[in-house]
Amino acid sequence: ITRKPAVCLVGPEGFANAVPAMMEAWGERSPVIFVTGSSTLKRQGAGGFKEIDDVAIAEPLTKYSVSITDGERINEFVDRAYKIAVNGYPGAVHLSLPVDIMFSSFDENAGRQERPFDLTAQAPARAWPEP
């Protein structure tokens, strides 16, 4: 109704419970940003207990699914996820955040030297033109 996305923050163990919500958001064309925790960067790919490829599972259920492996680029990925969730047909997007990055601190302007443009509010694009 408002075209503003909801945010669902899920820990690593709760990802399986978020999958039905992703399917529902996809079916209802609801803009939802799912931020899920995953195993630490050091332990990814080691076959640890409860380690799953959440990005691959969420990919067919969302408009965008990505794992953030560089904490200084969080702003960039969140901005992209927001735009994708609300533009065109609204829908769910998924950001996977390793636990070690999730509990780290980063400067608000981190990574700005790589993308020196200002992040300003933009009107959302419409799925169809004004009548």
Q: Where would I find each of the regions flagged by the language model?
A:
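N-terminal alpha/beta PP-like core and its mobile active-site loop of ThDP/TPP-dependent enzymes
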Residues: 1-131
